């Protein structure tokens, strides 16, 4: 069996990073709203493309979001969505 046939485990476990991701996303969201953009569309554009031009420099939002890996942002968004919407 080649190494391409094996499932790799992807794991994040740093709770302080989770808080940081939340703070960054909220700051970026607020900055986008203040500048008159649709925050959801702009954040999705950034996550899909990796192009920081989707995020304004206002409130240092562009620099903050670039300090995080996009997969960290996506992980936090998925985790938050599932925790909010999973059935009991």
UniProtKB/Swiss-Prot annotation:
NCBIfam families recorded: PRK05473.1
Listed name of the protein: UPF0297 protein BPUM_2379
Top-level taxon: Bacteria
A Pfam family reported for this protein in Swiss-Prot or TrEMBL: IreB
Family: Belongs to the UPF0297 family.
Xref: InterPro entries: IreB (IPR009309)
């Amino acid at each position: 069996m080649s190494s391409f046939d094996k499932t790799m485990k992807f794991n994040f476990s740093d709770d302080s990073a989770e808080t940081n991701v939340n703070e960054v996303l909220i700051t970026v969201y607020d900055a986008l709203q203040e500048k008159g953009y649709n925050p959801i569309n702009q954040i999705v554009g950034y996550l899909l493309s990796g192009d920081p031009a989707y995020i304004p420099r206002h409130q240092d939002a562009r620099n903050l979001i670039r300090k995080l890996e996009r997969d960290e942002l996506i992980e936090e968004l998925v985790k938050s969505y599932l925790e909010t919407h999973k059935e009991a």
